Amino acid sequence: MTKWFAYILLASVCLLLSCGGKSVREKFAEADRLVNENNLDSAAWLLEEQITLSALSDSDKAEYGRRLAWLHLLQGRSLVNDSLIDYSVDYYKEHASEPLLSAYFVKAIYMGDSRKGLEQRRALYREAIDSAYSRSDSTYLVRFYDRLTSLSFGEGLYRETIAESKEWEASPKAGFKEMAYYMAGLSYSRL
């Protein structure tokens, strides 16, 4: 009889403890609030210590990877260990989700921090530009063109930088054309 009582008591305590916590979405909202208040360390603690990755659904896992990598970027931390951003980009591409462009942006920075190959990073920017163009998102279109031309220029690929700058300049949806002219001019001066 005491054995059954102990089992019932243990089950009740477990049930009581499991009901008291916030949902993952509430924790994400709380982390967003902390980031907006510039409490980055508290937001990092919340995401890194209070969320169990193995218990997340696929969509929550993608969101977790994107948010954590973005937070590390805001903190100025290296993104070398944020390989979950790969999962986030793949998930958002597969489901045509809204956060895809910000995930691309963070993944490109992650690839730079982890010293991925130049062609891989250029291909990622190309893919991101296509996605931003199809969504008519001029903000991310400018960001991705800027990063792509800067990457190419930094690697000494001046002819490619000129071609990318001309493409940027010809794009009806991308703004900041003066940056495209500037990158093309710099590249012409190096030929």
Describe each model-derived feature in a short phrase.
Residues 1-6:
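Positively charged n-region of N-terminal signal peptides that target proteins for export
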Residues 7-16:
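Bacterial N-terminal signal peptides
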Residues 19-191:
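A "functional boundary" signal
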